[in-house]
Amino acid sequence: MTKVLVLWADTRSANFGVQVLARGLAELATRAWGPETVVEFQNYMPGDSPVSFTTRSIARDVGRRSGPIKTKLREYDIILDSGAGDSFTDIYGLKRHAFMVYASRSAAKLGIPVALGPQTIGPFTTAVGRRGGRYCLDRASVVQSRDDVSAEYSATLGRPVDARATDVVFALPRTEVPTSRDVVVNVSGLLWFSDRHGDSAGYRNSVRSLLGELRSAGRQVSLLAHVVDAVSVDDDAAAIRDLDSESRSGLEVVVPRTLDEVRNTVGSAEWVVGARMHACLNALSMGTPAIPWAYSRKFVPLMSDLGWDLSVDLAHEQNPGEVTAQVITTRKGADVGDQVKGVHDLADERLDAAVASLQTVGTR
């Protein structure tokens, strides 16, 4: 029986995208190493695991044979590193990057193989970040990208990927859900409250514009939170409350409590619009066309690799709301349905390649 630890993912996370990573990678692990495989999860902070892999634990682990991190890692035959989807980079700060490098270094010292599951690789904007990135790539038994831009970037760091995969959301079961909603709009607290990833005022105005355009076109709108955490400044539910209080729109608001509820909600829609990438990926994986509002490099390459060309670049599009509403009101359902099916076919092919490369772990 193989015991696998998935790093940087958690089935209890307030961010349903992180829950997707956990469940999707567990599915890949059992496909690769058999249904009896035991899969457990370790995020930065305690969640599914009682241990943290952050500063305090590292301080107690350095120089010790049986520190908290090494003790945890020793329980497993394989480490499956999710990179938190898009966090194998230094753009979120060197501190988070250091956590990942330390875990990789510790596993290497213990002789435990590390597989980098499908993820965005880079960019690394500092010399320290690039050294850490190369270190992790060089020591990984398997490296998988979830988009071709990441694959090419990994090659520039001296480590060609073993599989050009896609996001693990497409490994989750696809259940048919009756259509009961028109347009589901995910409002991102990350962009609503902070300028870290763009102009928050501009984003808020774009959301208001989108809702106005859709109402004018006679479309019914539901608002969806995809990160639900009352103590987080990134909380989507708080952003929706803010929006609703100013507009008094009376729109349906969905604040899900489980990942299945998220997937059922997006699966019930005619269209989904969102700046949380996994809100859109959940929709596409459930067969619902989605229009991502892209604020970083991670969006477009992944979508393009799957043949999905409907996205709006928030950094360059002057009228995201108007453009999005126009797509929704003019695209024909049958054509979009065929395009979604093509996405599924390509995703299945890429995830089959990911499973095949994982099966080589321990055989090299």
List PLM regions with ranges.
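Active-site anion-handling motifs in enzyme catalytic cores
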Residues: 1-364
